[in-house]
Each structure stands twice: as structure tokens, then as C-alpha cells.
Amino acid sequence: MPVLHNRISNDELKAKMLAESEPRTTISFYKYFTIASPQQTRDALYQVFTALDVFGRVYLAHEGINAQISVPQSKVETFRQQLYTFDPALDGLRLNIALEDDGKSFWVLRMKVRDRIVADGIDDPSFDASNVGDYLKAADVNVMLDDPDAVFIDMRNHYEYEVGHFENALEIPADTFREQLPKAVEMLREHADKKIVMYCTGGIRCEKASAWMKHNGFNKVWHIEGGIIEYARRAREQGLPVRFIGKNFVFDERMGERISDEVIAHCHQCGAPCDSHTNCKNDGCHLLFIQCPQCASKFNGCCSEQCCEELALPEEEQRRRRAGRENGNKIFNKSRGRLNSKLSIPDPAE
């Protein structure tokens, strides 16, 4: 029986990917459809993807599939054909091609079975996820942006909104999608008579969010087809003004795609204009935050003097300090004061 998971170290895989001479294409896609046996589907897809040298992150659940991957350019069309013929529900599926791509977005293939393909926290048996809002294409998005009766809702996390968003879009401040859904309903009650336009990176979150809003009594709900990625691509192809400002955050090694020239965020350490996310170089912290080149040099890629000092310790001492330390997904959140004035490690209990 073939091995259906990776057995090579991350360092070795990353070095191998960086040494590759063939360009790669970064692709994202999702589909809500019923998968009777997610584990069986996962194992079959794993063999298809590994045969094509696909890297990336793929989640499967009874409700569908969610994938962010990179494919060797010479194998993109073969990948497309094999994906489309794998299951009738995937035939003709829209593939979002990265807007900015150095081909180094992923270096390992990870495929996991989960309860949901996007964690929504919804526990309501009467919720119909298929009753979604209407799609908006790029030209229609620009029309809606000029409609005083329309409200644009950003269904991404606060750190994504911070570096880029549509003009006058409403932020639903939260660290996770599951936190956003109830907040969105609460915040939009006063706009119940408006046209609600929801968007996210590639469409998966705003599609489900549009169904959740309709479930909660909102009748005029739209969502942007293919999210920010598809909107920007189609607007450029059609010669339309691109109304998204700043950078589109992405969940891979690139950390972002430049959409417009404006830099609307600031370094979390000195306040200089900057929209480049990074993870604290101290493995015992790994905080996600925005850091300008000057502060990266000053703090050696760390989020604080404390982490700088820890990074300078012998590796054995660093490992000892990391042992038993809570180190989940930590994110700098200015609005909630997750860090103190010295930008030390946030309280993991928060």
C-alpha cells in the first residue's frame, strides 16, 4: 500500500523546493458538495496530487473541499483535467490563479480531514448552507461600490483587513471566521434594508457567510465571485478600475499579493508605513505581525527585545524554554491590545 503522508523533514523539503528549476503556479479552489467518505476521498486525491508533484494545504470534510496548492507549470493542465474528472461535482470548478507568484508558496503537501472545510462554529440544524447570496462579477462589484444603498462587508480576519480592503468596506473585527459570523449579524441589523455585499480572499468564507446572513433574515445579500483574487484578475483583464486598496493577505509563504500601490498599514513596532507580515523569528513565539525592514534589522526579525534576547541563546536553552510553552496561532491585534507597549509575547490565555 502506498504511503499516504509525508515522511521527509520540513527543512529538507523546503531546501528541495527552493532548488527546483521549474516554475510553479499557485492555485486555490474550493467546493461545497457532499463527500460521503472524506477519508477515502482524501487518500485517493493524495495519490493523484503526489503523482503530479503538487504541494500545498488541502482540507476535506463531508461538506466539501478547500485547497491552496502549488503545481509545476508543465503539469497545470494535467492537474486541471484530473481534478475535473475525479468527481462530477468538481467538473469545471473555478481555479483561482495567484495574482503575484514566485512559485515558492508551499514545499510540502498536507491533506487533512476535518469537521468543516472552514471553521464556522455554526451549530444550527436548520441552517441551509446551500441557500447562498447572489454572485457579483467584477463589473457589478464596481457598480455596487458606487451604490449608496450597498454596504460592503469584509469577511476576513482583522490582520487581513489591516493591509488591504475595498473602499469603505466595513470590518467585522475578529481573529477568526467563527467569531465573525455572529458579530456580522449583530453589526448589520441597522443595515437590514441595505444591499449587503460580502467578500473574502477566494470566496469560501463569504459564500458561507452570505447563507448565514440569509438564514438570519437578511434578504438582499450578494457575495463576490471568486473573492478578491478573481475580482482583481477580471478587473485587470477587462480594463476596469481596481477598487481594492492595498495588499491581499494570503495564507502561504508569500503572506500577501500586491493589488494597488497604496500602503495603508503601519509597522507594529515603529509606526512607519508598511504592509509586510512576518512571523517572529523566535520559534518560541512565532507571532504574526507587521514589520518594516528597519525594525527587522533592529530586532533581528523578532517582535520584541525579549524575543531578540531569547533568539541569541544557545539552541539547547531555547528548546528548554519552549518546552511546555503554549504556542498556538498568535496574532498581533492592535484593536484588542494583544501586546503591551514593548511588544512582548501576548498572553496565551486571551
UniProtKB/Swiss-Prot annotation:
Keywords: Oxidoreductase, tRNA processing. Residues 146-240 form the Rhodanese domain. InterPro entries: Rhodanese-like_dom, Rhodanese-like_dom_sf, Rhodanese_C, TrhO, TRHO_N. The keyword tRNA processing applies. It holds the Pfam family Rhodanese. One of its GO terms (biological process) is tRNA modification. GO terms for molecular function: oxidoreductase activity, acting on paired donors, with incorporation or reduction of molecular oxygen. Residues 319-328 have a biased composition (Basic and acidic residues). Its EC number is 1.14.-.-. The active site is at C200 (cysteine persulfide intermediate). Residues 319-350 are annotated as: Disordered. It catalyses: uridine(34) in tRNA + AH2 + O2 = 5-hydroxyuridine(34) in tRNA + A + H2O. It is an enzyme of class 1 (oxidoreductase). Catalyzes oxygen-dependent 5-hydroxyuridine (ho5U) modification at position 34 in tRNAs. Belongs to the TrhO family. This is tRNA uridine(34) hydroxylase. It comes from Salmonella agona (strain SL483). The gene is trhO.
